Amino acid sequence: MSIMSYNGGAVMAMKGKQCVAIAADRRFGVQAQMVTTDFQKIFPMGDRLYIGLAGLATDVQTVSQRLKFRLNLYELKEGRQIKPKTFMSMVSNLLYERRFGPYYIEPVIAGLDPKTFEPFICSLDLIGCPMVTEDFVVSGTCSEQMYGMCESLWEPDMEPEDLFETISQAMLNAVDRDAVSGMGVVVQVIEKDKITTRTLKARMD
């Protein structure tokens, strides 16, 4: 069994029209054994910037804390909010530093540029190689199912409510086909003037 699927989990991000959405499941388990159903996998890294971490649960918490530390140092030094692309480089550097004994996580970043409010999404592998796309990114144990759902449902330039519906349906249907993820979904829709957080009920078996 791969260490990446030891705890299970699924994270996804999508672009819309002047908005982005990021979603993650809530399950934390050890292989087939369930531990909790409210595990945090999406972390705020700015006013309109979020990171979702799928992979080994211990590394999820370690990396989120180390990123917060580096982010605070950056904002103190620069005196401004970090741009999503710069934050992607920060995450990439953190992961690549540990390439010979990596953090077993695959991050997904979603946010809006603090000045232009341009939507940005990307995913990285466990040694920090980034992939920036214009539609959607996925990470976790049911990535094949998530890709299938996203390719079926995603459309360009969706309004925030349509984007929420699309990412919710894609996520709920993908995690239903994976034994080690699910137990509810948290969705954040990031817009220019507000962030909407919704918790969705899912199958609990």
From Swiss-Prot:
Name recorded for this polypeptide: Proteasome subunit beta type-3
CC annotations in GO:
cytoplasm; nucleus; proteasome core complex; proteasome core complex, beta-subunit complex
Keyword match Nucleus: yes
Species of the source: Oncorhynchus mykiss (Rainbow trout)
Q: What are the GO BP annotations of this UniProt entry? A: proteasome-mediated ubiquitin-dependent protein catabolic process
Question: Which keywords annotate this record?
Answer: Cytoplasm, Nucleus, Proteasome
> One Pfam family name from the record?
Proteasome
Instruction: Please describe what this protein does.
Output: Non-catalytic component of the proteasome, a multicatalytic proteinase complex which is characterized by its ability to cleave peptides with Arg, Phe, Tyr, Leu, and Glu adjacent to the leaving group at neutral or slightly basic pH. The proteasome has an ATP-dependent proteolytic activity.
Cellular localisation: Cytoplasm; Nucleus
* Top-rank taxon, per record: Eukaryota
Which gene name belongs to this protein? psmb3
Instruction: Fill in the subunit field for this protein.
Output: The 26S proteasome consists of a 20S proteasome core and two 19S regulatory subunits. The 20S proteasome core is composed of 28 subunits that are arranged in four stacked rings, resulting in a barrel-shaped structure. The two end rings are each formed by seven alpha subunits, and the two central rings are each formed by seven beta subunits. The catalytic chamber with the active sites is on the inside of the barrel.
Task: Please report any disulfide bonds recorded for this protein chain, giving both cysteine positions.
Answer: none
Q: Which InterPro entries match?
A: Ntn_hydrolases_N, Proteasome_beta_3, Proteasome_bsu_CS, Proteasome_sua/b, Proteasome_suB-type
